[in-house]
Amino acid sequence: MGFTGPLKYNKWKIKIAALRMYTCCVERIDYDEFFEKCSLPDTLNSWFLVTQLHVWMCLVRMKQEGRAGKYMCRYIVHSMWEDVEQRGKVMGIDSVTLKNSMRSMTEIFYAAIFGYDEGIISDDRILAAALWRNLLNKQCDDPRKLELLVEYVRKQVQFLDTLDGEDLLLTGEVVWRPLVEKDAQSILKPSTPTYNDEGL
């Protein structure tokens, strides 16, 4: 059928789910914790860097859902740019400066996506380098911060992989794990049923 054939679900439902998923990226993240643990200033740019990391994790998950998932990815990103523009206007940034900032953010976003994609399929050193470049702006002298971020991304992507694709396409509902978590293994669903000694 090719790319132009009908999608598995109604396009409007997918767009609404995409907006909901993006909303989960901005409303369910503890930005103050990220700013504190990563020594980031409380600015629009820092907000954007943390948001784009979570948007990227959603894109990684939704690309696994075929054409409908890729269609949803377009609208997650579209929702992000609309939100960035609105936040800039609310902050009183003039239109020329905002346009230039958004152009710069677009370049940053696609460079980050490339780096994060490479990092997630590689080892922790590559992912740490991508986080250092893109989230921390090459300003981190504490390797424990990078270790925390690498662990966070790995556990979050692993958790998102356990979520049902059909539900994600229809609802866009995503729950985020805390940045600092005592037992990261607690997020994983058991891959096989567990039984006691009696086989129950």
From Swiss-Prot:
Gene field: uqcc1
Family: Belongs to the CBP3 family.
Membrane as UniProt keyword: yes
Name of the protein in question: Ubiquinol-cytochrome-c reductase complex assembly factor 1
Described function: Required for the assembly of the ubiquinol-cytochrome c reductase complex (mitochondrial respiratory chain complex III or cytochrome b-c1 complex). May be involved in cytochrome b translation and/or stability.
Stretches that traverse the bilayer: none
Subcellular location: Mitochondrion inner membrane
The UniProt record lists the keyword Transmembrane helix: no
Organism: Xenopus laevis
Gene Ontology biological-process annotations: mitochondrial respiratory chain complex III assembly
Gene Ontology CC: one annotated term: mitochondrial inner membrane
Keyword entries, A-Z: Membrane, Mitochondrion, Mitochondrion inner membrane
